[in-house]
Amino acid sequence: MQSTEPWSPSWGTLSWDYSGSGSLDQVELCPAWNLPYGHAIIPALYLAAFAVGLPGNAFVVWLLSRQRGPRRLVDTFVLHLAAADLGFVLTLPLWAAAEARGGLWPFGDGLCKVSSFALAVTRCAGALLLAGMSVDRYLAVGRPLSARPLRSARCVRAVCGAAWAAAFLAGLPALLYRGLQPSLDGVGSQCAEEPWEALQGVGLLLLLLTFALPLAVTLICYWRVSRRLPRVGRARSNSLRIIFTVESVFVGCWLPFGVLRSLFHLARLQALPLPCSLLLALRWGLTVTTCLAFVNSSANPVIYLLLDRSFRARARFGLCARAGRQVRRISSASSLSRDDSSVFRGRSPKVNSASATW
């Protein structure tokens, strides 16, 4: 995963970007003007996402990791997903500072590599974990009996471990081939990948394997489960809708970026010849969609807070001095299946079972 791309108003300036920078052939010959006011708007968006995502995801991790007794299956997925989002948002101040300086990276080569690697790993892990959670929800609703052997705590931990392992492998190119690259105008250095054409093919392949494929799995499971929503109970239906909201927001935030990123890879490989006007529009589109994708890292806690009364109750208790005793008194109310319940579902003195959707 790479940084967003702040393009210089000068001609032929080496660009760096989350969406794949460095100038090659046709792309190098086209002007790369900055998105108007991007140096002010983009850092503000990143810092806002950091301000929301850091405490929000940290609270979700704290809330789920301190649970006593057996952890429910979906709890494990959401815990790992929150951890991935937390790792993602921790890098946002660095990219915000670089964006504010017109794309010049002030933190040295080491932090450039580590931050790029962290973005790649956490983005990939998030996509794979959501795909795994989608499959689990489909099995819970569509195959509750036949899939019971697969829906065990051990299997879910193995799936999460495999997702992280795949994500770390997918992030290695960012660790190995990204670093400080001098801008062509000699003003400073930018955090960019090395301008090798072969890296574009690798990037496109990784995008297909770590984004397009998990996205397809998520959408198929979403469609299959949605067909069964009218036949499930109210509590299960509400729980599934919260999960679907999380997945839909992820798709809405990342799909535009994935499409434009693929087009940009193809353009840099000269497989998709584009005039300079369309290349500039593509670059600006990547800037906007990258911001949208980055903001997704702070979205899930907001979704839980808005849609789940039980989570709001637990959040209130968690912020109180007596949170420990009160949270331990929260009991399960309803479940998505007989052996699995949703993430923040519970009963508090002010939350009835109908509203405890997770």
Curated annotation (Swiss-Prot):
Q: Which residues lie on this side of the membrane: Cytoplasmic?
A: 65-76, 135-155, 222-239, 308-358
Q: What is the membrane topology listed in the Swiss-Prot or TrEMBL record?
A: Multi-pass membrane protein
Q: Which GO terms describe its cellular component?
A: membrane
What keywords are assigned to this protein?
A: Disulfide bond, G-protein coupled receptor, Membrane, Receptor, Transducer, Transmembrane, Transmembrane helix
Q: Which Pfam families match?
A: 7tm_1
Protein location = Membrane
Topology Extracellular: residue spans: 1-43, 98-113, 177-200, 261-284
Q: Where are the transmembrane segments?
A: 44-64, 77-97, 114-134, 156-176, 201-221, 240-260, 285-307
According to its UniProt entry, the function of this protein is described as: Orphan receptor.
This chain's protein is named Probable G-protein coupled receptor 25
User: What is the species of this protein?
Assistant: Mus musculus (Mouse)
Q: What is the lineage of its organism?
A: Eukaryota, Metazoa, Chordata, Craniata, Vertebrata
